[in-house]
Amino acid sequence: MIPSSIRKLMQWAGPKGLINGPANKLISVYQHEGKELSVDIGLTVPQEVEGENEISKGLLSGGLYAIGHFEIGTDEIPAAWSLMYTLTSKHQCKPCAGKSFEIYQSIPLDQHPQDKCMIDLCIPVQMIDLKLIEEKAISILTECDTAMLASVTEEGY
C-alpha cells in the first residue's frame, strides 16, 4: 500500500513529467526536532520547478554521506538503518549535522517481483581519523551533490 503523501506527490509530479526521468528520485528525508521525528516525502526536481498547494520546494544539502544500498522488504528498513549506524561507527565515521534520507531506486515502489524495495540509506557523516580508514570502508562514503526537492510532509510521524 502506497502512503497518501507519496500518492499526493505523484499526482502533482505526473502531469509535469517529473516521475520517470533518470534524474527524478523519490526520497524520504528525516528531520529530528529534539525527540520528535518527522519525515518529508520528496522527489528530486530541476531547479526551475516550483511547488504549489501542499507541495513545497526545498534543498537537500550536499556533503559527505555514508550510503548503504539495500534490496529489502519495507519491514526490514529499521534494521537496515541500525546496521548503517553500526557500520559508520565501525569505519571511523560519526553522524554529523544534516538530514538522513532514503533514496528509492524504483518508482513506482510496488513493481518488485518479491515485494522488496531497492533503497539507498544515506547518513551525513564526518571522518574521525582518516588514517584509520580501511580501503573497503571508503566505498560506503560518497560526496553527494545538493539536490532540489519538491516535498510533502508525511502524516503520523
Residue ranges of model-derived segments:
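Binding-site signature for planar aromatic cofactors or substrates
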Residues: 127-157
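A solvent-exposed interaction/effector surface
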Residues: 1-128, 157
